[in-house]
Curated annotation (Swiss-Prot):
Keywords: cGMP biosynthesis, Glycoprotein, GTP-binding, Lyase, Membrane, Nucleotide-binding, Phosphoprotein, Receptor, Signal, Transmembrane, Transmembrane helix. Residues 22-507 are extracellular. One of its GO terms (cellular component) is plasma membrane. The chain crosses the membrane at residues 508-528. It catalyses: GTP = 3',5'-cyclic GMP + diphosphate. Implicated as a cell-surface receptor on spermatozoa for 'resact' a chemotactic peptide, and on various other cells as a receptor for atrial natriuretic peptide. GO terms for molecular function: adenylate cyclase activity; ATP binding; GTP binding; guanylate cyclase activity; peptide receptor activity; protein kinase activity. This is Resact receptor. Residues 1-21 form the signal peptide. It is found in: Membrane.
Length: 986
């Protein structure tokens, strides 16, 4: 971006230098209107004369500029209250003069410029740098479409490359995918070809070849080398459709050359030409030069000049006849022609008069008719003034170029040509194109009577505001193809070299038997599958004989079902050793415990729709879909048997306070529910229709399964359950989507997937609040249902106070997305699964796997804990052994450590030292606290107090008489102070 800006500044600097060098030669012509009102000024650049003072391209079309100014000054709706004055400059197609005029007009406060009419990149870049509006009428350069560098530049003339869209539509219309493009080697037509080639390259099946002829070829010059014969000879064997990009006269000569080569006689070739110049032509102008001479009613010298020019080419009537014959195979795409009405002739005359009058003062030479440039000049002037008026009316700044031109982008206007033109998003002009074909003209044209052959429009190419082009064919006009009834093919049926038909005869004997075998096999397989399907429909594998269903014999309700086996009955399931609570009517069918769902009908008609439903139910197989066991149609036991899930429904679990639900538990149940809905919505059943927490059951493995799905035709027409109260009927609707509530009884029993998504959001609120839906809403059930179905803004939904505290953000986001009022704005179940993906982060697919993973982690931690506790136990054991050895004799301690019982012993003789505690303390308070250290005392003694009180406990062996002396000695020593512990008086 910085480099781009630097280049932009450099270009502007160069422009300023060029402007300064040209300022001395700048000579504008000023036209002022003074009616006593404020004056506004605009300028026009045109090439009135060439550098050699010969007549330029601006004559006589520039005469439309003062005419447009005059119309605006007289129009009460354009800049009312102002006089619009103008200046014009003859640039001679000199860039310096044009930029000098732009710079001067900008400094003098002009409001915009029309032109320059020649090259426009430098002038447009300068005007954009000055924020100065510029609308051109003849510029055909591609860079000016880039609004990053040319933000204030627009043009009423369509760029040449715009014709490519119409060319491609023509090729599409006739299925022409392979073409050879013949291009004049000049920038204008090379740009058109390159744009077309880019479109071809984007389509794999399209193929484009390319031929060029030299620039400046003059078909009227007898000395000019005719390039087309060689091109046609080189390409005719690999081409059927030619696309020609060159001048109109060159196209005429190319068609004549193709006729001379002989490729047009068979009708197998066609030419599509693009005529994108400024000339205004009649139906005869594309092929007949004689018509041009005879129809011209201008001055005599003009006819003489034309005749003199054509004599150089040795013109003969035969040329026109050959061109007319060649045009049978030519289609021409060109701009929508001007309606040659009386108003147009008046306009043309005024433009020419203006060109001959002040301020132009032109002279009448060879060219006496106006072209489309006059229309583009008139339109550019008018649209600029309208944009200024719109800016003024909006309170804007008319001197802000960007603000002024912003009123023109992507707008349509009525052109002076009496057709609807446009400015696109790049400020380029847009007009309609027509497809010309040689047919008998339906109306007189340019003096030729109806029925004369001519190139006449058979349809119009129109651009919509979206930028899309379409072809509007005239229903009354059809192309007349040369020597055939339909358009030619873009290649022969067998290819240009017969490659598409090679060896068909050789392989015919193999292909036909192979086809018969494949077709016969496919047909047989189809018949087999069809019969198998019909047999599956006719089979009664789903049918359950009520006699095979074992239920508890007790009183029954009106449908013949056991009343004691209804909801919340507490019986034991024989196949399960544990006591379990039963949450539905259950029975045993062929050894399988099943939930029995009564159908309140008197009989079942086994129509094809019912049998198809039963087959679909049998085919439903998924871990999170409750299996269908069968159906009983025996009166009065009409019912549906589903697999029984012992843990009950999700609603039962939510209401059971003994079951603690942590985040892992809830995440697992939600994941199961989502997986079940994904399978259900992708199956042929499509949707549940009555999804609620009571229809979500949990089996012994804590896997959630969806039940009560499908069989809508089977249940159709059943009576209401007489045992169901009014409150329960209303409570069932709390999960129903508002659009289904509004449908009432007309609701399809199967509902819709988006209705299931709404029900899913209500179930989520139950799971995280552990309460019934809408429990925090202070309204009766009937009022709640009425407000939900009403579709209020914002919609009435459950209060989420409890859910906000417990649920993670992803769940809250999913809830709010799933219960929006408009079903089309609700996510599908796949998108819901993505929303809730954070819940499953780090978790296994189901809750049992998660519990096993937790137990594995616990086991690993437990092993480490056991090792640690074992080491601590060993240390404590050692401490205990030491304590035992200190408290007990070694022999006794050893026996206890080994676990051997210590038996009591009997002694024949014992010596006991007696002393009361008081006397003992008084006596020994007079002694120092020392151990007995006499050699006569056994070293088994401990400190005095402990030793004297526990001496009998330390007898390791049975001693005889020495024992007496051993125990007597310390006693004697204590009494008589004969120990080495000196007694001292207090």
């Amino acid at each position: 971006m910085a480099t781009t800006r630097l280049l932009f500044l450099l270009v502007v600097a160069v422009m300023i230098t060029m402007v300064r060098s040209a300022t001395l030669h700048y000579n504008p012509t000023v036209i002022n209107l003074d009616r006593g009102r404020p004056k506004l000024h605009i300028g026009m650049l045109t090439s009135w004369t060439n550098a050699d003072n010969s007549q330029g391209t601006g004559f006589p079309s520039a005469g439309a500029f003062p005419l447009a100014i005059q119309y605006a000054n007289n129009d009460m709706d354009i800049l009312h209250g102002y006089d619009i004055n103008f200046e014009w400059v003859d640039t001679h197609c000199d860039i310096n003069l044009g930029m000098a005029a732009i710079s001067d007009w900008w400094k003098r406060g002009f409001l915009g410029v029309i032109g320059p009419g020649c090259g426009c990149t430098y002038e447009g870049r300068l005007a954009s740098a000055l924020n100065f509006p510029m609308i051109d009428y003849a510029c055909d350069e591609n860079p000016v479409s880039n609004k990053e560098f040319y933000p204030t530049f627009l043009r009423t003339i369509p760029p040449s490359i715009q014709v490519v869209d119409s060319i491609l539509l023509t090729l599409d219309m006739y299925d022409w995918n392979q073409v050879t493009v013949v291009v004049e080697n000049i920038t204008k037509y090379r740009n058109v070809f390159n744009t077309m080639k880019e479109q071809f390259d984007m389509r794999e099946e399209w193929e484009i070849l390319h031929e060029e002829y030299y620039a400046g070829f003059d078909p009227w010059d007898p000395d000019a080398a005719e390039p087309f014969t060689d091109i046609i000879q080189r390409t005719k064997k690999t081409t059927r459709i030619y696309v020609f990009f060159g001048d109109s006269g060159d196209l005429r000569q190319f068609a004549i050359s193709a006729l001379d080569v002989g490729i047009l006689n068979s009708g197998d070739y066609a030419i599509v030409g693009a005529v994108i110049d400024l000339e205004i032509r009649d139906s005869q102008d594309y092929h007949s030069l004689e018509y041009t001479l005879e129809a011209s009613d201008y001055l005599e010298q003009i006819n003489q000049a034309y005749e003199q020019m054509f004599k150089l080419r040795e013109y003969t009537r035969t040329d026109d006849e050959r061109a007319l014959e060649a045009m049978k195979s030519v289609l021409i795409v060109t701009g929508e022609p001007v309606l040659r009405s009386q108003a147009w002739h008046i306009y043309s005359a005024i433009v020419i008069d203006n060109a001959l009058d002040e301020p132009f003062n032109g002279t009448l030479e060879l060219k006496t008719d106006i072209d489309m440039a006059s229309v583009y000049i008139f339109d550019a002037t008018t649209e600029l003034l309208k944009a200024l008026d719109a800016t003024l009316q909006a309170g804007g700044d008319m001197y802000d170029g960007s603000q002024v031109v912003s009123n023109l982008f992507n707008t349509s206007y009525r052109s002076k040509a009496k057709a609807d033109y446009q400015f696109d998003e790049n400020g380029d002009g847009v007009k309609s194109y027509v497809l010309l074909h040689r047919i008998p003209i339906p109306v007189g044209d340019g003096g030729m009577p109806p029925g004369s052959p001519g190139m006449y429009p058979i349809g119009t190419f129109v651009r919509a505001e979206s930028g899309h082009w379409s072809f509007n064919k005239d229903p009354d006009l059809n192309p007349v193809w040369h020597n055939r009834d339909d358009p030619p093919l873009d290649m022969p049926v067998c290819g240009f070299h017969g490659e598409l038909c090679t060896n068909w005869g050789l392989y015919l004997g193999t292909l036909i038997p192979a086809f018969i075998i494949i077709f016969g096999g496919g047909l047989g397989y189809y018949i087999y599958r069809k019969r198998a399907y019909e047999a599956a429909l006719d089979s009664l594998v789903w049918k359950v004989d009520w006699k095979e269903v074992q239920t508890r014999e007790s009183e029954t309700n009106s449908q013949g079902f056991s009343m004691k086996s209804m909801v919340l009955s507490a019986i034991s399931v024989i196949s399960n050793a544990e006591k379990q609570q039963i949450f539905a009517t259950i029975g045993t069918y062929r050894g399988t415990i099943c939930a029995i769902h009564a159908v309140h009908k008197n009989h079942i008609d086994l129509t094809r729709a019912v049998r198809t439903e039963l087959k679909l139910m049998r085919d439903m197989r998924h871990d999170n879909i409750c299996p269908f066991i069968g159906a009983c149609i025996d009166r009065p036991h009409i019912c549906i048997l589903m697999h029984y899930c012992a843990k009950g429904s999700l609603q039962d679990i939510m209401e059971n306070d003994d079951i603690k639900l942590d985040s892992m538990f809830l995440a697992s149940l939600i994941a199961d529910l989502v997986k079940g809905l994904v399978y259900l919505h992708s199956s042929e059943i499509k949707s549940h229709g009555h999804l609620k927490s009571s229809n979500c059951v949990v089996d012994n493995r804590w896997v959630l399964q969806i039940t009560d799905y499908g069989l809508h035709e089977f249940r159709k027409g059943q009576k209401e359950d007489v045992d169901l109260g009014e409150h329960a009927k209303l409570a069932r609707k709390l999960w129903t989507a508002p659009e289904h509530l509004r449908e009432g009884k007309s609701m399809h029993p199967g509902g819709t997937p988006k209705g299931d998504i709404y029900s899913f959001s209500i179930i989520l609120t139950e799971m995280y609040s552990r309460q019934e839906p809408f429990h925090e809403n202070d309204l009766e059930l009937a009022d709640i249902i009425a407000r939900v179905s009403k579709g209020e803004v914002p919609p009435y939904r459950p209060v989420l106070n409890a859910v906000n505290e417990a649920a993670p953000d992803c769940v809250l986001t999913a809830i709010r997305a799933c219960w929006v009022e408009d079903p089309m704005e609700r996510p599908n179940i796949i998108e819901v699964r993505t929303m809730l993906a954070p819940l499953q982060k780090g978790l296994k697919p189901n809750i049992l796997d998660n519990m096993i993973a937790i137990m594995e982690r616990y086991t690993n931690n437990l092993e480490e804990l056991v090792d640690e506790r074992t080491q601590e136990l060993q240390k404590e054991k050692a401490k205990t052994e030491q304590l035992l050895h200190r408290m007990l004799p070694p022999s006794i301690a050893s026996q206890l450590i080994k676990g051997i019982s210590v038996l009591p012993e009997t002694f024949d003789m014992v010596s006991i030292f007696f002393s009361d505690i008081v006397g003992f303390l008084i006596h020994f308070s007079l002694s120092s606290c020392r151990l007995f250290c006499s050699s006569q005392v056994l070293p088994l003694l401990v400190p005095w107090l402990h030793s004297l009180l526990t001496l009998p406990l330390h007898l390791p062996l049975i001693w005889m008489n020495p024992l007496i002396s051993s125990f007597a000695q310390p006693s004697w020593s204590a009494l008589h102070s004969h120990s080495c512990s000196a007694l001292h008086s207090s």
